[in-house]
Regions:
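Glycine-rich, histidine-containing beta strand-loop boundary motifs that form or position
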Residues: 70-72, 154-156, 225-226
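Bacterial Sec-dependent N-terminal signal peptides
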Residues: 1, 7, 11-35, 379
Length: 409
């Protein structure tokens, strides 16, 4: 869950005017549209609204034409639409104008940014975490855009692959009962019949093997954090221009921007922590295959494996959510990661970054034991998780089904 609050206004430039009159020349229009699916009907409402503001500010600085479509189910300030769920469109001409008007300055109220969005679709109240709703909304968003390539941002609460109400796999629409399982998300995306260039998970714990494997066939790349994402989320104003480029080097810049942002906050005395990875989805099958070899080779050890000495990423929600994948493999092999596994991990994780100094200090990550992916290691204390874990495709693909645990699994 996103955990801390930053004063929204202090994160924007303090300018005396509410209009930006710069007039740079545009380049050729970019062929990729970004879709942002924000499940904000919860205590992240203000933070996700701030994310829209940050995306808007990033668009205003672009020198090329670009389109952003946002699904918003939080509060609104748009006339009588308070009970509506909306698709909002923001289109920059690359000359400082958004939706045909000079871009608002970053100092303007965030509700004004929301009101500047062109309403291209309205829905009656609906559950945004329903797979049919998600599929329909994404289909509608794609229909409102002419390009054939799309990137996708998910913003909300999340807890990796876990299925219980307490942990929330993805999203929270109203009360804690209304959440979404990862397989349902994948089914919703598959129904759209469009492979996304990337998925950026602005949500906690999504940088795990279980999640990355689940989404491997619906997107080319995944940008995610294995631990909690701070409340402010990703600093879109710093990097959204890179997302539109649609290549690996620019996705790496997105990840680096995320790390640099939280390093800066830490240096200024604020609460700050971060992990982020760029995952090549097409490599997840090969990684699962290499992992299966390791799990089968060490199945007797894993039958009663003590994970307490491994780097663990559930800092606020208690232990066992995810241990570091590379650290586990190294530990099973006497402190060395076998070359075949190491080579495949390097092909899969194209960028990894973390904060070794964090505030609170318990959120610090040891870089030497950070591989860029977390993994759930079945433990007896999590019987409810284990029951659901066995239903995942990952359970068999990674070889966990080959382990005979010393306790009732």
């Amino acid at each position: 869950m996103k955990k801390f609050f930053l004063g929204i206004c202090s994160l924007f430039f303090l300018l005396t005017s509410c209009w930006n009159n710069d007039d740079p020349k545009p380049n050729n229009p970019d062929k990729l549209t970004i879709l942002a699916y924000l499940v904000a009907n919860n205590n992240l409402d203000d933070y996700l609204l701030a994310n829209i503001g940050a995306m808007y500010d990033g668009l205003a600085e672009m020198k090329e034409e670009a389109t952003l479509l946002v699904y918003w189910d939080g509060r609104t300030a748009i006339g009588d639409n308070n009970s509506k769920h909306l698709i909002l469109k923001y289109q920059t001409d690359g000359r400082g104008n958004i939706n045909g008007a000079p871009a608002l300055d970053p100092s303007c109220p965030l509700d004004d940014v929301l009101a500047e969005g062109e309403i291209v679709k309205e829905y009656d109240t609906q559950y945004s975490v329903d797979k049919d709703v998600m599929s329909q909304v994404l289909t509608d968003m794609i229909a409102k855009s002419s390009p054939t390539k799309f990137g996708l941002i998910f913003g909300s609460h999340a807890s990796s692959w876990l299925n219980s109400i307490y942990t929330r796999a993805f999203g929270q629409d109203g009360n804690g009962d209304n959440t979404m399982l990862i397989p349902d998300m994948v089914e919703a995306l598959s129904a759209v019949n469009k492979k996304f260039e990337f998925i950026l998970f602005d949500a906690c714990y999504m940088g795990t093997t279980e999640v990355a494997y689940a989404f491997r066939n619906v997107c080319n790349y995944q940008l995610s954090s294995v631990m909690e994402v701070p409340a402010y989320g990703f600093p879109y104003e710093d990097f959204i221009k890179y997302l539109y480029k649609g290549n690996v080097d620019d996705y790496k810049k997105v990840c680096q921007s995320y790390i640099d942002f939280y390093k800066r906050l830490y240096s200024e005395g604020n609460s700050a922590w971060a992990t982020v990875s760029l995952i090549d989805s097409k490599e997840m099958d090969y990684l699962a295959s290499e992992l299966k070899k390791e799990i089968v080779a060490h199945k007797n050890v894993l039958a009663n494996y003590d994970t307490d000495h491994l780097q663990e990423y559930g800092r606020s929600n208690g232990p066992y959510i995810a241990c570091d994948l590379g650290h586990m493999i190294s530990d099973l092999n006497g402190g060395t990661i076998p070359s075949a596994f190491s080579d495949q991990l390097a092909k899969t994780i194209l960028y990894k970054g973390c904060l070794e100094k964090a505030r609170p200090a318990s959120y610090a990550v040891e870089a030497m034991n950070y591989s860029g992916l977390g993994i759930y290691i079945p433990v007896e204390a999590r019987s409810n998780w284990n029951k659901y874990f066995k239903t995942l495709d990952w359970y068999t693909a990674s070889g966990w089904n080959e382990v005979t645990f010393s306790w009732n699994f």
